[in-house]
């Protein structure tokens, strides 16, 4: 199974390779930054945009990806879980990223409350998402249900901005990427 996970992870990184430099700029890794990557899989992309962080934690619900990630990226910490119930104390991270994964969250309101809770004061949320018109077709719904238990919920950038505002995030920005868009907000 690790061969399949490796192939899928590498394919995902190849598809997003043009967005990784922008993502790294938004995450702004540094020696004082603790990063949580929600839905980070085996961490293959994470090491490309977050290297230089003091601590990198991958939160992933798929045990196969966690097993592969622990072997492939031993310096990273891997935790099984979902965004709706983050198993971390308050103020644990200066950055939280969700790279092409927020649309898989079953309860976005609960997830954003949890994300805000674990972000330290002044910490930043970085979302990289896909445009609905390009990815919300029947194939995405079927594949999402098969792989994640429910179909994905793709958001327009302005809708995601409004959701972040409603959850108390500030300094929100939306920028276009090569294969999607970025939304950032601070606690």
Task: Report each predicted region and the residues it spans.
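C-terminal alpha-helical "lid/dimerization" subdomain adjacent to the S-adenosyl-L-methionine
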Residues: 3-17, 45, 126-184
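Conserved alpha-helix/loop element of class I SAM-dependent methyltransferases that forms part
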Residues: 13-33
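Structural signature of beta-strand start/N-cap positions in the alpha/beta core
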Residues: 34, 55, 77, 92-94, ...
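Class I SAM-dependent methyltransferase SAM/SAH-binding core
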Residues: 36, 41-85
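A conserved beta-strand element that flanks and buttresses the S-adenosyl-L-methionine
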Residues: 97
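Short catalytic micro-motifs in class I SAM-dependent methyltransferases
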Residues: 100-101
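A short glycine-rich, Lys/Arg-flanked "PGG" loop and its adjoining helix->strand segment in the class I
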Residues: 109-121
């Amino acid at each position: 199974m690790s061969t399949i996970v490796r192939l899928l992870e590498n394919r995902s990184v190849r598809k997003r390779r043009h967005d990784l430099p922008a993502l790294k700029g938004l995450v702004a890794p540094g020696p004082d930054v603790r990063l949580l990557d929600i839905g980070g899989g085996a961490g293959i992309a994470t090491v490309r945009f977050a290297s230089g962080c003091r601590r990198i934690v991958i939160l992933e619900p798929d045990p196969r990806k966690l097993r592969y990630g622990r072997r492939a990226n031993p310096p990273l910490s891997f935790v099984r879980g979902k965004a709706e119930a983050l198993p971390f104390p308050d103020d644990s991270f200066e950055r939280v990223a969700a790279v092409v994964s927020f649309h898989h969250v079953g309860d976005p309101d609960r997830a954003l409350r949890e994300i805000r809770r674990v972000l330290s004061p002044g910490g930043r949320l970085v979302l990289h998402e896909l445009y609905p018109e390009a990815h919300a077709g029947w194939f995405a719904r079927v594949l999402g249900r098969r792989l994640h238990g429910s179909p994905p919920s793709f958001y327009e950038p302005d809708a995601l901005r409004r959701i972040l505002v409603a959850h108390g995030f500030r300094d929100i920005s939306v920028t276009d990427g090569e294969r999607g868009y970025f939304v950032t907000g601070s606690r």
